[in-house]
Amino acid sequence: MSLLLTIAKEYKRLCQDAKAAQMMTVGTVSNYTTFKKWTTSRKEKNPSLRMRWAMSSKFPIIANKRMLEEAQIPKEHNNVALWEDTEDVSKRDHVLASTSCINYWNFCGPCANNSEVIKEVYKSRFGRLERRKEIMWKELRFTLVDRQRRRVDTQPVEQRLRTGEIKDLQMWTLFEDEAPLASKFILDNYGLVKEMRSKFANKPLNKEVVAHMLEKQFNPESRFLPVFGAIRPERMELIHALGGETWIQEANTAGISNVDQRKNDMRAVCRKVCLAANASIMNAKSKLVEYIKSTSMRIGETERKLEELILETDDVSPEVTLCKSALGGPLGKTLSFGPMLLKKISGSGVKVKDTVYIQGVRAVQFEYWSEQEEFYGEYKSATALFSRKERSLEWITIGGGINEDRKRLLAMCMIFCRDGDYFKDAPATITMADLSTKLGREIPYQYVMMNWIQKSEDNLEALLYSRGIVETNPGKMGSSMGIDGSKRAIKSLRAVTIQSGKIDMPESKEKIHLELSDNLEAFDSSGRIVATILDLPSDKKVTFQDVSFQHPDLAVLRDEKTAITKGYEALIKRLGTGDNDIPSLIAKKDYLSLYNLPEVKLMAPLIRPNRKGVYSRVARKLVSTQVTTGHYSLHELIKVLPFTYFAPKQGMFEGRLFFSNDSFVEPGVNNNVFSWSKADSSKIYCHGIAIRVPLVVGDEHMDTSLALLEGFSVCENDPRAPMVTRQDLIDVGFGQKVRLFIGQGSVRTFKRTASQRAASSDVNKNVKKIKMSN
């Protein structure tokens, strides 16, 4: 008791001084939290929340005062307090500082060179901050929000990789010596590995940090979250700020264009291959599968097979649905109608047939459904929920979109529901020629109507007028749709309402498998047609910069730069030891087979058309002359081989061999299209992309079968020795020298030394000589 009384008296005496009283009554947050932590025995229930609370104060951290003064860190920068000259009571010579002091140290202090490294390490966080600044916030509405728990991506990435692919990339980038054998992903995307190595070379980062950065760059961080509305990653990272159970914050988030562009690119490629397969007279289904499996798309620096992208996507567009049906992939319960995407929500209709007369003469049958059904529809920027029953569109609610998209979406929903007077009497402008394709196939009447409204704006409005026009109720002004697609119309269309926000597509948990006919019609197990080739919009002139069409039938669709690189890559893969490989054909001087290789034929459409005969004469003469004299380079022969396919023709040669895209190669001269180095003959560069030349003889990781040739040893290069194939070695006599292709474009001279000599006794010597002669 006496001790407490003594402390109280001392406290009263100290409080007579104003400064001392303030120091004893006002403590720092750091002191308080430290005191609470070490004086309580209970476990902190929410350490993250306490840390955030502590860091929210003005000066939550401490800093060495001497270091701040030596580094000339100001107390204030851009009206933001960095530190104050108040000593921390828990640590001597330290003052109170704010978190902004750290930012100033990193970006403006003596270690400012680290700013770029810090930006790279926290690239995903800085990107999130930039996207946050681009958001256009709108009104806050209070309403009940129907949220669904779904698996969504919470981080937008430039290119998405699987977990196993990210691990392979980390190992090959950071631990090259300990990395496992190259997977197919590494072989196809080795350029990405080299890019990552050069990106992080000579930077003050440990490997654990770089591994974390690689994972953040390619991992979209999928989570199960209660969501509503669109599920783009740019929106999901802010879903906590966009709505709750009883409120919605309207906002336009950033990053929409890139996602939409990728979706449109894949739809365009699928549409091209579907139309190309449909143009074939027979086996359209098998042709479509061939086209899909021979096509790949480049996303960022990663090249992905179109087949993989189709099976992974949840896109329900008609072109993607047809391609997925051809591959046998599962789909949700979706269907397509022209360019409109549909998903059934409820109901099950019974199919009924009816008749409409064309020009009052020809009777054409069409089908409709007698029971009530509800659907979700999507066309470009507009979405809708609607109900159909019998031959009518009972009601429709359209969300978002511009006026033109809303008009066309409503028109397609009317045709889908067989609504309007034109399903009783056909328009007078529809003729008999509109009822069939150029190949004579009959077009169903609903697709005839789809083509009809595409011909003119008058046809579209005539169909909408058949819906019926009513006076807009003043109390519903702004929620009804006029004939021009606007919201605030005096006269509106019957039973058509508009809402401001976009309607989200309901998730389809049940998966089905579709069958694809040779007429390219996808149908389910009950025989219902889900998508047809007639659903595809008219073909547009689309250029593909990041798509590789390997199939010869699709040569007209190729991006020529990529096609040239792929063509040379295919030729380089023929540098093997097989009977039909390029070295064997050269040794046998089988020029006809050499000029008609499938890989040469594949590149034939890429040659400048008006000069192909002249180029063929020059290229064939170069090949035959060099092979005959024995002084040739396989790298140079590969360079001119694509120009040898056509029949030779006389003409003036200007010294360069041009492709149809005006790029060229020049015999004996390196350029950007084709280059190689004698110092490193293991690689050929096409448009800056390194293509590895196949190895036949090498170290323990390579095929050493040629080093095990019984009775042969490697000797000095002798250009007079005949060039033979591996199969002809049995005819070589004792003491004779022959030249043999050993890989990487190299030719070595071998000498027959004995008839019965153990192969194992020559292994070490042969491999050593080969390595020394390289």
Curated annotation (Swiss-Prot):
One of its GO terms (biological process) is cap snatching. One of its GO terms (cellular component) is host cell nucleus. It is found in: Virion; Host nucleus. It holds the Pfam family Flu_PB2_2nd. One of its GO terms (molecular function) is RNA binding. Keywords: Cap snatching, Eukaryotic host gene expression shutoff by virus, Eukaryotic host transcription shutoff by virus, Host gene expression shutoff by virus, Host nucleus, Host-virus interaction, Inhibition of host RNA polymerase II by virus, mRNA capping, mRNA processing, Viral transcription, Virion. The keyword Ion transport does not apply. HAMAP family: INV_PB2 (MF_04062). Plays an essential role in transcription initiation and cap-stealing mechanism, in which cellular capped pre-mRNAs are used to generate primers for viral transcription. Recognizes and binds a wide range of cap structures of target pre-RNAs which are subsequently cleaved after 10-13 nucleotides by the viral protein PA. Plays a role in the initiation of the viral genome replication and modulates the activity of the ribonucleoprotein (RNP) complex. Influenza RNA polymerase is composed of three subunits: PB1, PB2 and PA. Interacts (via N-terminus) with PB1 (via C-terminus). Interacts with nucleoprotein NP (via N-terminus). Belongs to the influenza viruses PB2 family. This is Polymerase basic protein 2. It comes from Influenza C virus (strain C/JJ/1950).
